[in-house]
UniProtKB/Swiss-Prot annotation:
Organism in which the protein naturally occurs: Thermoanaerobacter pseudethanolicus (strain ATCC 33223 / 39E) (Clostridium thermohydrosulfuricum)
Residue numbers binding ATP: A10, Y11, S12, G13, G14, L15, D16, T17, S18, G118
Native organism taxonomy: Bacteria, Bacillati, Bacillota, Clostridia, Thermoanaerobacterales
InterPro entries: Arginosuc_syn_C (IPR048268), Arginosuc_syn_N (IPR048267), Arginosuc_synth (IPR001518), Arginosuc_synth_CS (IPR018223), Arginosuc_synth_type_1_subfam (IPR023434), AS_cat/multimer_dom_body (IPR024074), Rossmann-like_a/b/a_fold (IPR014729)
Protein known as: Argininosuccinate synthase
Enzyme Commission number(s) of this protein: 6.3.4.5
Amino acid sequence: MLKGEKVVLAYSGGLDTSVIIPWLKENYECEIIAACINVGQGEELKYIKDKALASGASKVYIEDVKEEFVKDYIFPTLKAGAVYEGKYLLGTSMARPLIAKKLVEIAHKEGAKAIAHGATGKGNDQVRFEVSIHALDPSIKIIAPWRIWDLKSREDEIDYAKKKGIPIPATYEKIYSVDNNLWHVSHEGGDLEDPWNEPKSDLYDIITPPDKAPDKPEYVLIEFEKGIPVKVNGKALEPVKLIEELNAIAGRNGVGIADLVENRLVGMKSRGVYETPAGTLLYAAHKELEYLVLDKETMRFKDLVSQKYADLVYNGLWFSPLKAALDAFVEETQKNVTGVVRLKLYKGNVINAGVKSPYSLYNQEFVTFGKDEVYNQKDAEGFINLFGLSLKIKALMEMERKDMDEAVGR
């Protein structure tokens, strides 16, 4: 047991972790070190220290890692073009390994033998946290209350919190599970558990519903250097500010909503509604630039890498050797991903409105429908003959066999 020992709790101030503090003290008789890792949660962190102490924590860490989150987690994933199941831009998935890393650092600093988290036994986060923690320090014990305690639902948690006098943001009527960081806001649970239910218009936190967005389109310029966004509308911005600026621009135009029934790592399907305004713009712009500067074979292979990269991140394998190897490949592909992309935003839509790069592989002289001096169209005949030779031979052989069969009366 951990009686008298220190336990570091991944603390968010939400429903799950709010009830975990008194539960751990009651069941383990341990000292709770609450660790809130700031990946851009915003206003919800305002009173989090007082709340954690009032709930029974002996000490509270609040670590601002937004810049590290963008530079070392968001940008590598963006450069990889990783998207899970065609829609999910991995906002929660990317944040978990960074949070796990900081929890391990705090545990080492405090001499704690265990780390606790509030992820449920049905979800992906339990895997992401625990695999990441043990990749960094396999000796640390992990406590996952959701897999142990008698509280079987969020309603049970609300009752427990009221019993312990703990203020919580959730109610019986609004019991969405919300994850909020600089990159996205995710919504799960409640009426969203039925895929037939349309998300309510007041669900969204950072995006204007598309039907309520401005009636006039807005243009935005995004400049990249070696796959990394560096300027918005000609203005150089630090990574965190750049994400915040694009969140505002995309959000007011209704851009960045993804409603997805996804395949969880643990084997079941779940529904999530994601708000990723800046990410939606950056992925769109980055891809348009890659279309311009990458050769065909690299693009095709990178598409395969992007899918595998997304699976690794989603499944909690951020610190795996394979991901490190894929990072090396991705980095090589990004050497010429430099240029400017212009996007047109209108009521939830993102439309390419122009792209340019000093490393463009597009040559207008070769593709023009007008008169040109560089391409001899007669050359296409020989190419077509060789390109289709295998099919031509196959057809000839089939015709010969058919003639032979007819000759012998088959």
